[in-house]
Curated annotation (Swiss-Prot):
InterPro entries: ELMO_dom (IPR006816), ELMO_domain-containing (IPR050868). This is ELMO domain-containing protein C56G7.3. PANTHER family: ELMO DOMAIN-CONTAINING PROTEIN 3 (PTHR12771:SF2), ENGULFMENT AND CELL MOTILITY (PTHR12771). It holds the Pfam family ELMO_CED12. Residues 141-303 form the ELMO domain.
Amino acid sequence: MEAEPLETEQDEWRKERMRVLDEWCEIELKGADALKMDVTREPGSPTVAVAPETSLQDLYPLLIATSSSNAPPSATPTDDVTDPEVQVVSRESIDNRSTFNRIIDVCLCRPVKSQMGPKAYTDKTLILKLAQIPYDHENGTHWLLLSDYFNNVSRSLMTSSEYSHVTNPSRVGAHWVTVGFQSATPHTDFRGCGVLGLLQMHTFTQRVPANLLRAIVLLATTEPNDFPLAVVSINITSILLTQLKKGALDNFGNEIEGLYPFFSALHASAMCRFCSIYKSQKCTLANTQTIFSEITRQLEKSPLSLIMLLNPTNDELINTLL
């Protein structure tokens, strides 16, 4: 005698329920490790825009070193991830519901927000810390990044034969205004984002292709619609920091690259978006806040769509900037 359809459905439901409970038990045992996944890239999408680079955990000790200590601090960055000055919710407290309620969510197929993995969480913490560290004249790494930014921007408009005539800039002078700062003392512009603003500014000049960087620098320095490129970069870093503090970027980190590569790629993409709008709409300095608001809206809607601007197959930047 064949089983009744209702009994068959009940058996299938019981099996499915046991499977879900078994999976949840594994998650309970392994913790965040069971929830690891690469959410930096969409399945099947090009991944060139998010390239591997120097680990933020390697850069951090160099960026926080002070004049009184030439050697990096002995403590590792991860030792400080619970620093109360950094207002980040710890991974363990992200989901403080009872085990029963979480099992119910799984059984009912309710969407559950995945926790940040240790590497992504550490990157987020260090990014927020760097935003609080002021530029230090005595820190060799700070000066190296700043002078290299100057050279990258200056050389973008030169021919290869002119490179040899470029020398390291003096620390104070009108030449800093030509690369996008507000005054002859560039360090004063970093007050809003600390050395994170400097790091992102430098990374931007290395991340974008040479022909694109040349077009952007040319746009920023051509009167009468010129704009301070460095200041725009710092403002975009500030916008990204706001999104980071809100938790809007938490799901874009992974345990291979962490969160920092995505953060810096997003900064470069937002810079390109700013320049694309600025040129295509024939904007002036009076329109910059409107453009920043538009970039913020796009970040809130879909960070991935913004980051795809740097995809080599995307013609938008070629059509507007080149």
